[in-house]
Amino acid sequence: MNPAEDGAKRVVRGALVKVLVHRRTDRGMRLEEHAARCVRRGEVHELVTTDQWEPRPGARVDRVGFLGFVELECGGVIDRGDLVRIGDAVVGTVLGFDACHLPNHYNILIHAERPASGLDLELRPEDAVSFTQGRAGRERTAH
């Protein structure tokens, strides 16, 4: 998000369709150059947490926790710095996107205090997920 250019936007909502329960310290994801991605209703994307914060194109992200896959209930724009909630809990803020699985899905990288998995957060299929407009990454992690 660029506060000098961007106004308000809708909340992007979805539901978990599959929970993942593992973590890795050598994943090798690469941060895409784009800080925002347009998404469509019905798309499924993977949610991945990391404690790494280096928001530059090509940054390598190794320490990750896999939360699961979300099906989006509406289209919209997901920006770096957006708050990610699952149920009533703030999981973290969007760091960016890894496109290694395109055209199948994006890995949406979420900055969190630690790389948590779906098991760690006791997630379940159908848990509500939301991406709410943040403050352009000024806050690395929502507490």
Where are these regions (language model features)?
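Hydrophobic beta-strand signal
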Residues: V84-R85, S130
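Short, basic/aromatic beta-hairpin or loop at an interaction surface
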Residues: T50-L67, N107
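Short alpha-helix capping/helix-loop boundary micro-motifs
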Residues: L67-E73
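Long, compositionally biased intrinsically disordered regions
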Residues: L31-E33, C38-R41, L47-T49, A142
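Conserved "cap/hinge" positions at secondary-structure junctions
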Residues: G87-D88, Q133
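Short, well-ordered loop/turn sites that connect or cap secondary structure elements
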Residues: V77-D79, V84
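Glycine- and charge-enriched low-complexity intrinsically disordered segments
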Residues: N2-R27, V39-R41, L102, Y106-H143
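Short beta-strand-centered aromatic/proline hotspots
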Residues: V90-C100
